[in-house]
Amino acid sequence: MGLSVIILAAGQGKRMASSTPKILHPLGGIPLLERVVNTARLLNPHTIHVVYGNGGSHVREKLNYLPVHWIEQSQQLGTGHAVLQAIPFCQNEDRVLILYGDVPLISPKTLNSLLENTPSNGLGVVVAELPDPTGLGRIIRDDFGNILSIVEHKDAAEHQLKIREINTGIMTTTAMNLKKWLPQLNNNNCQKEYYLTDTVALAVAEGCPVGGVAAQCCEEVQGVNDRWELTKLERYYQRLMAKKLSLAGVTIIDPERFDARGENIEIAPDVVIDVNVILEGNVQLDRNVRIGPNVILKNTTVGENTEIHANSVIEAAVIKANCSVGPFARLRPGSVLEEGAKVGNFVEMKKTTLGRGSKANHLTYLGDTIIGKNVNVGAGTITCNYDGANKWQTKIEDGAFIGSNVALVAPLTVGKNATIGAGSTLSQDAPPDQLTVARERQRTIKGWHRPTKKE
């Protein structure tokens, strides 16, 4: 028996008050639907079917990299109708698991428990007990605790509304069962929809075993209906990430002011992360790294014993061991800092390698530049890499000393151990071991007086 997963993602999401389809809104930097797909893949299904509707072409365009089978539900007539669109693509002997594109934190542990504890010919649902179950379907049991049916909130009687055990919507049974039950559904209810939950009563009526598996926590089965629910779930997720990292030996100064936006974040023990830090995409931090407040790291690797000072923004960079960056530094894609390099305040780099032990301490732009070892780049230095049409490369060889307020008009090479005088504008190569100065000689004009204002 193989496993087919059906993810229902066709809801309109009106309460999000957004032109973006609900399932494309991110949680922890990843779209809601993608999170559910990633979890489903951990179960090793042979196929993942996604039933989409609202904003369909936009959803497929944005998430076309996902390994799923897309099925359009042109009319949103309820969850039962949505599953009916996908079930013809499932083999009769398949075990079918039904998930929801707006329930992003469901855990593989709970899903495995559901699959393992549901008889091969039975039906299983994930249930949860909530302090306030308003708006959610209730689990109806007999005196022996057996599940009899699920009643939606709008269709529930007064005594049923007092029940706190709710249906999460997550369900598993065989494809053969669904092919038998789904055509029997009707829309004789308050919402005039075909409810998937009505299959529970059909299963009970024919003696099919029905069981429930409890969710580990309320948050893992929390659906996202509006921005506020998404915000609360985001904070819960970030606290989970902070706790996971802390238990692995990372110091998170304030878990309430920490954001991890991506699933490929690897942080070694003894790293210290200050407040308002955002880690996005693929981020790797080695031992003893210190990240100051208000730092953004995206798709970046940082070597051991390196310190990133406050308010630095770093994207797609490689920073090796024992480096110092910032405060207020910006490293753009393609930046590489070799071991012991230093980038100070208000320095911007792009497609530039700063060699071992080299430093650019202040107020500098380095673009399309290869810098060797033990180079000093003075304050106010600019590599002029763009001529209005093309980018050109600058090379600064080992041991060079670049004075303050120097403009290097690429393409050019500054030779090994060369010294460039402050205020120079170079448009030709500077030879090694020599002082090169490219500026007008200072002169004083005798007898000159400042102009005076006319009366």
From Swiss-Prot:
The UniProt annotation puts the region (Pyrophosphorylase) at 1-227
What Gene3D superfamilies has UniProt attached to this entry? Hexapeptide repeat proteins, Spore Coat Polysaccharide Biosynthesis Protein SpsA, Chain A
Q: In which pathway does it act?
A: Nucleotide-sugar biosynthesis; UDP-N-acetyl-alpha-D-glucosamine biosynthesis; N-acetyl-alpha-D-glucosamine 1-phosphate from alpha-D-glucosamine 6-phosphate (route II): step 2/2; Nucleotide-sugar biosynthesis; UDP-N-acetyl-alpha-D-glucosamine biosynthesis; UDP-N-acetyl-alpha-D-glucosamine from N-acetyl-alpha-D-glucosamine 1-phosphate: step 1/1; Bacterial outer membrane biogenesis; LPS lipid A biosynthesis
Enzyme Commission designation: 2.7.7.23, 2.3.1.157
Residues engaged in binding acetyl-CoA: A379, N385, Y386, S404, A422, R439
Where do the record's region annotations for Linker lie?
228-248
What reaction does this enzyme carry out catalytically? alpha-D-glucosamine 1-phosphate + acetyl-CoA = N-acetyl-alpha-D-glucosamine 1-phosphate + CoA + H(+); N-acetyl-alpha-D-glucosamine 1-phosphate + UTP + H(+) = UDP-N-acetyl-alpha-D-glucosamine + diphosphate
Extract the GO molecular function terms from the UniProt entry.
glucosamine-1-phosphate N-acetyltransferase activity; magnesium ion binding; UDP-N-acetylglucosamine diphosphorylase activity
Enzymatic class: transferase
The entry's active site is H362 (proton acceptor)
Residues of the signal peptide: none
Record's GO cellular component terms: cytoplasm; membrane
Name the keywords, alphabetized.
Answer: Acyltransferase, Cell shape, Cell wall biogenesis/degradation, Cytoplasm, Magnesium, Metal-binding, Multifunctional enzyme, Nucleotidyltransferase, Peptidoglycan synthesis, Repeat, Transferase
Q: How is the cofactor bound?
A: Binds 1 Mg(2+) ion per subunit.
InterPro entries referenced in this protein's UniProt entry, alphabetically = Bifunctional_GlmU, GlmU-like, GlmU_C_LbH, Hexapep, Hexapep_transf_CS, MobA-like_NTP_Trfase, Nucleotide-diphossugar_trans, Trimer_LpxA-like_sf
N-acetyltransferase: region residues: 249-455
Which BP terms in the Gene Ontology apply to this protein?
A: cell morphogenesis; cell wall organization; lipid A biosynthetic process; peptidoglycan biosynthetic process; regulation of cell shape; UDP-N-acetylglucosamine biosynthetic process
> Where does the UniProt entry say this protein principally localizes?
cytoplasm
Q: Which residues does the annotation say bind Mg(2+)?
A: D102, N225
- Residues binding UDP-N-acetyl-alpha-D-glucosamine are 8-11, 22, 73, 78-79, 100-102, 137, 152, 167, 225, 332, 350, 365, 376
As for subcellular location, the record says: Cytoplasm
Q: Which NCBIfam families match?
A: glmU
The record describes its quaternary structure and partners as:
Homotrimer.
Q: Which family does it belong to?
A: In the N-terminal section; belongs to the N-acetylglucosamine-1-phosphate uridyltransferase family.
**Protein task:** Catalyzes the last two sequential reactions in the de novo biosynthetic pathway for UDP-N-acetylglucosamine (UDP-GlcNAc). The C-terminal domain catalyzes the transfer of acetyl group from acetyl coenzyme A to glucosamine-1-phosphate (GlcN-1-P) to produce N-acetylglucosamine-1-phosphate (GlcNAc-1-P), which is converted into UDP-GlcNAc by the transfer of uridine 5-monophosphate (from uridine 5-triphosphate), a reaction catalyzed by the N-terminal domain.
**Name by which UniProt lists this protein:** Bifunctional protein GlmU
This protein's species is: Coxiella burnetii (strain CbuK_Q154) (Coxiella burnetii (strain Q154))
Instruction: Tell me the name of the encoding gene.
Output: glmU
